[in-house]
Amino acid sequence: MLAAVLTAPPEPFVPPEIVGQKVVGVLGCWCGGLDQGAAALEPLRSLKPLVDVFSPMPYPALQQMLDGSAPPGLRNYFRGGYAAGLSNDLIDAVLDHGARMPSPMSAIHLHQMGGAVGRAGPDGTAFSGRAAAYTYNLISTWTDPAEDGQHIAANRDLAARLAPLAQDGSYVNFLTDTAGDSNARVRAAYGDALYVRLARLKREFDPGNLFRANHNIRPAR
């Protein structure tokens, strides 16, 4: 389950009167019986959402639902983190910033964790934050290079506000900040124990660091 603060897009399923307004959207996936899925959705549907496009669909269709919102050529800046819960301070920060996002293409995502994600051990895979209840992704997207500073600054402001509320680590896919020591940020994203293990594997399988065009883990010395 994912909740997002975003600008209502000009899509056929969106009522014209809310297009361009800041809204909260909920995305989810139920992999099981249709009757059980409908029952799981009932608490959300009882809130009478302005738009409801939940329906049975093939898995590839689910994967393609948001493709149209990310065409080639956009400018992007991402940050993220993990949270133990949805505190009032976290919700207030997200809603306050969400109402002032300078681009209609930007969004703030709150992903529910737990379940299968949390059943793996903390050092069993190359993924940190398995004990977190939520992960948040701050997604800034725009088109004009002249506006880079404005959108990056807005994203960093929210990241700084959320930092005291966050747990250790972050989701590496949303680690696009290039300020400061990038290796230190990558290490912080994975956590010390996991980073050390990955650095040793890097030394074994890629000692020359050929595969480095990424959030790089340097081979252990």
Description of each model-found segment:
Residues 1-221:
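Soluble FAD-dependent oxygen oxidases
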